[in-house]
């Protein structure tokens, strides 16, 4: 059992570390005429030049046909037809299919990129907002001063109100005293006038009354005479 | 000469090894394994896209019980389409031209749908034998007809075999008579051969699809 445990501990371990995963090549291997790898041409170039691989191909073909290693039979024609169709299909629709596959990958990347961009913009916005808040916080002294001014003004207003109130109250009391004094004086004056009048009326003796009435009658007669003279004239 | 025309469909053996086993399993290397990467090369991307779309479309009419068959149906579709398309290349052997293979695929799968239907919902499964709205006098005849139609469903396999065999045979015959022909007449035969090639490509894909589609239809009825 111990040996088995040792083996179990060595599962899924290897000395090669594949992390991070090696990157894939961007493009596939280069080919000439779609089928033949470019490396063949590079290998043969030093010895046989540019036409080397073509001569090799033609020679191989001729050899195979002439030695009847490959016999031309009905399958050759079927192969020619099928080959034409396949090559036509690949040449015509190949780029579209490749573009489609690339588009699928692009969309995948774009979705992730959108998420990342959204996160970035929201974080940048958060930074902006934070900076603004810090700037706002700097102005808090002004805020405190304004508030302090407000409070002082309120207190001042209150104090002045109270002063006015006190002034009014005191004035009211003084007015009351004045009114009281004037009332007193008026009453005294009225009383004195009444007393004088009463005394005067009681002091008028009957003979003085008669004399004054006689004077009034003579005055009236004179006035009547004057009036008569004025109307006749 | 008839025997030589059908020679292309003889199951090939080499030194006693049935090469059909190789023909059945080797196309698997054409499909790259989906890698652990997030962004893949074009082949894996297209393969993944195709498999996803196909499975989604196939499972649309099926309810949840039928979704268990998703892996089976999609892999069957890929299998058949690969075998058919590869068989169009010259000097290749198409395993799906063998009746034994196609019946071996069709009969067990069809029987599975029937047994599932009979086991889980026998009333509904038997109810499929009588379509709705049939006039009363026709009922006995119709039940017999529907039962026959039920048991003929393994013709799924026969359909595939027949279509592919016929297509390959036509191409072989047209190419064979093209060989010793005069050039002027040969042009017409070449056109025929070219059109047959196009047809065969279409048929190869369509027949695989029809196989899987009908199977999913039988499943939909019974699951």
From Swiss-Prot, chain B:
Single GO MF annotation: proton channel activity
Catalyzed reactions: H(+)(in) = H(+)(out)
Subcellular location: Mitochondrion inner membrane
Major location category of this protein: mitochondrion
A Gene Ontology BP annotation from the UniProt entry: proton motive force-driven ATP synthesis
Keywords attached to this entry: ATP synthesis, CF(0), Hydrogen ion transport, Ion transport, Membrane, Mitochondrion, Mitochondrion inner membrane, Transmembrane, Transmembrane helix, Transport
SUPFAM superfamilies: F1F0 ATP synthase subunit A (SSF81336)
Gene3D superfamilies, per the entry: ATP synthase, F0 complex, subunit A
Superkingdom: Eukaryota
TM ranges: 12-32, 69-89, 98-118, 132-152, 165-185, 197-219
Entry-linked InterPro entries: ATP_synth_F0_asu, ATP_synth_F0_asu_AS, ATP_synth_F0_asu_bact/mt, F0_ATP_A_sf
One GO cellular component, as annotated: proton-transporting ATP synthase complex
UniProt membrane topology term: Multi-pass membrane protein
Similarity remark: Belongs to the ATPase A chain family.
Subunit composition and interactions: Component of the ATP synthase complex composed at least of ATP5F1A/subunit alpha, ATP5F1B/subunit beta, ATP5MC1/subunit c (homooctomer), MT-ATP6/subunit a, MT-ATP8/subunit 8, ATP5ME/subunit e, ATP5MF/subunit f, ATP5MG/subunit g, ATP5MK/subunit k, ATP5MJ/subunit j, ATP5F1C/subunit gamma, ATP5F1D/subunit delta, ATP5F1E/subunit epsilon, ATP5PF/subunit F6, ATP5PB/subunit b, ATP5PD/subunit d, ATP5PO/subunit OSCP.
Function field: Subunit a, of the mitochondrial membrane ATP synthase complex (F(1)F(0) ATP synthase or Complex V) that produces ATP from ADP in the presence of a proton gradient across the membrane which is generated by electron transport complexes of the respiratory chain. ATP synthase complex consist of a soluble F(1) head domain - the catalytic core - and a membrane F(1) domain - the membrane proton channel. These two domains are linked by a central stalk rotating inside the F(1) region and a stationary peripheral stalk.
NCBIfam families given in the database record: ATP_synt_6_or_A
Record-given protein name: ATP synthase F(0) complex subunit a
Gene behind this protein: mt-atp6
